[in-house]
From Swiss-Prot:
<dbReference type="GO" id="GO:0051607">
    <property type="term" value="P:defense response to virus"/>
</dbReference>
<dbReference type="GO" id="GO:0009615">
    <property type="term" value="P:response to virus"/>
</dbReference>
<dbReference type="InterPro" id="IPR050804">
    <property type="entry name" value="MATH-CC_domain_protein"/>
</dbReference>
<dbReference type="InterPro" id="IPR002083">
    <property type="entry name" value="MATH/TRAF_dom"/>
</dbReference>
<comment type="subunit">
    <text>Self-interacts. Interacts with RTM1.</text>
</comment>
<protein>
    <recommendedName>
        <fullName>Protein RESTRICTED TEV MOVEMENT 3</fullName>
    </recommendedName>
</protein>
<feature type="coiled-coil region">
    <location>
        <begin position="235"/>
        <end position="289"/>
    </location>
</feature>
<comment type="function">
    <text>Required for the restriction of long-distance movement of the pathogenic tobacco etch virus (TEV) without causing a hypersensitive response or inducing systemic acquired resistance.</text>
</comment>
<keyword id="KW-0611">Plant defense</keyword>
<dbReference type="Pfam" id="PF22486">
    <property type="entry name" value="MATH_2"/>
</dbReference>
<dbReference type="InterPro" id="IPR008974">
    <property type="entry name" value="TRAF-like"/>
</dbReference>
<feature type="domain" description="MATH">
    <location>
        <begin position="6"/>
        <end position="134"/>
    </location>
</feature>
<keyword id="KW-0175">Coiled coil</keyword>
């Protein structure tokens, strides 16, 4: 059975409550050889009381006359406190996009008072998150861009870091345990911030290995990486403590291995001596048995 959707994109809208624009767009993403984007009306489209949200062809003018895209998609307003409360307003809707219909969606995605309600879960740290899942079922007209040559990368915003979806869960858990982790981080460039976070995840992955899988060079590299991240402003006392524990375990493991090898060699020598001693005992037993044997009449005569 094929995948229900080809791609899943998360759009994070920052400072949603203070947006002044009537219309905002997501970055472009590529599905089925076509550039798409999401467009949102934070104050509502012909409905001032609801968030309006649409999926659209990003650059329709780049497509030839007569182009069409038969598409199935789903829009979800994410509840950041509870997956069960996330609102899926469009469920597997199928729509033909063409020159006359370049956008399709809902003028009333969700009431604004529900979004802004205290502890509703839709706004967290001023951020609103929207997910679109999309599958292109049929294409008429040449492709304007191929999936293979696209440089667009799907990312998810986690506490101001643009990360791969595969990294998001681990980083969210890390911030939940250590909320001050990046409060003093100096680099503001998104690429640098992402690079530092990837380095931090790699370091944690290294420390998660079994002691026998790590070399002394790995530990030296880990200390260098830790120093670099602390210089950048990360608060990593908890990780430094863990690195020390891992280093200590590595030293204990190496010392134990050395001691174990010596004990095994000693045990081997002792076993050999036992075998030799057992042979001597058997030999002496034979002598004793011979000495104790009675002398027969034939032996005397």
């Amino acid at each position: 059975m094929g995948k229900q959707f080809d791609k899943k994109i998360t759009w994070t809208i920052k400072n949603f409550a203070s947006l002044l624009s009537d219309l905002i767009y997501s970055d472009h993403f590529v599905v089925g050889g076509c550039k798409w984007h999401l467009r949102a009306y934070p104050k509502g489209y012909n409905n001032a009381n609801s968030l309006s949200l649409f999926l659209g062809v990003a650059v329709p003018t780049s497509l030839p006359s007569g182009w069409r895209r038969h598409t199935k998609f789903r829009l979800t307003l994410v509840n950041q406190l509870s997956d069960k409360l996330s609102q899926s307003k469009l469920n597997e809707l199928e729509q033909w996009f063409d020159e006359k219909t370049t956008n399709w969606g809902l003028s009333s995605m969700c009431p604004l008072n529900e979004i802004h309600a205290k502890d509703s879960g839709f706004l967290l740290n001023g951020e609103l998150k929207i997910v679109v899942e999309i599958k292109v079922l049929e294409t008429i007209g040449k492709l304007d861009v191929t999936e293979e040559t696209s440089t667009i990368t799907e990312t998810v915003d986690v506490n101001g870091f643009q990360l791969l979806p595969s990294q998001a869960k681990s980083v969210s858990r890390m911030f939940a345990k250590h909320p001050e982790l990046a409060s003093d981080l100096r680099p503001k460039n998104p690429n640098l911030r992402t690079g530092y976070m990837s380095l931090l995840l790699s370091l944690i992955e290294t420390l998660s290995q079994l002691p026998q899988q790590m070399s002394k060079d790995d530990l030296l590299d880990a200390y260098d990486a830790l120093g670099s991240m602390r210089d950048a402003g990360f608060k990593l006392d908890w990780l430094e403590k863990k690195l020390y524990e891992v280093s200590e375990k590595k030293e204990n493991e190496e010392a134990s291995e050395t001691g174990l090898q010596e004990m095994e060699e000693e045990l081997k020598d002792m076993k050999q001596k036992c075998l030799e001693m057992e042979a001597l005992v058997e030999k002496e037993k034979a002598k004793v048995s011979t000495a104790k044997a009675p002398i027969s009449f034939d032996d005397i005569v």
